[in-house]
Swiss-Prot record:
Family annotation (SUPFAM superfamilies): Ribosomal protein S19
UniProt source species: Pyrococcus abyssi (strain GE5 / Orsay)
GO MF, one annotated term: structural constituent of ribosome
A GO-annotated cellular component: cytosolic small ribosomal subunit
Gene from which the chain derives: rps19
Its job: Protein S19 forms a complex with S13 that binds strongly to the 16S ribosomal RNA.
Protein name: Small ribosomal subunit protein uS19
Amino acid sequence: MARKEFRYRGYTLEQLMNMSLEELAKLLPARQRRSLKRGLTPEQKKLLRKIRLAKKGKYNKPIRTHCRDMIVLPEMVGLTIYVHNGKEFVPVEIKPEMIGHYLGEFAPTRKRVQHGAPGIGATRSSMFVAVK
C-alpha cells in the first residue's frame, strides 16, 4: 500500500513552503498563531537564518540551538536540528508531521526515573534483616 501524501489542514507540503509566515499563521493553532503574530525573537531569527543557509548548502555545521520555543515551519522539514534539553543537544530530525509544534516538544528535559533495588530498611520486612 502506498504511503499517504502528507497534508496540513488540506495543504500539501509544497503549498505550505510557498506560503508567507502570515498566511501560514492563519492555519496554525491559536497559541502558535499568537506567537508568530507577535514576531520572531532575535534568537529565532538567527536560527531561521541558519536554516535557510543550510537549505542552500552554505552552512555545513550542525544546527544547534537553545531556542526551544521556535515553531516548526515548513522550510525546516528534512533538516536535523540539535535542540538543547538543559544538559546536552538532542538531535531532532524535522518531519512534515511536526509542522506547527514547538522544537522543545521533541527534546525532553527530564529523564524517566530508573529505580534500583530497595536497600536495607526500605521496607518493613527488611528492617530486621542482619547487615552482615
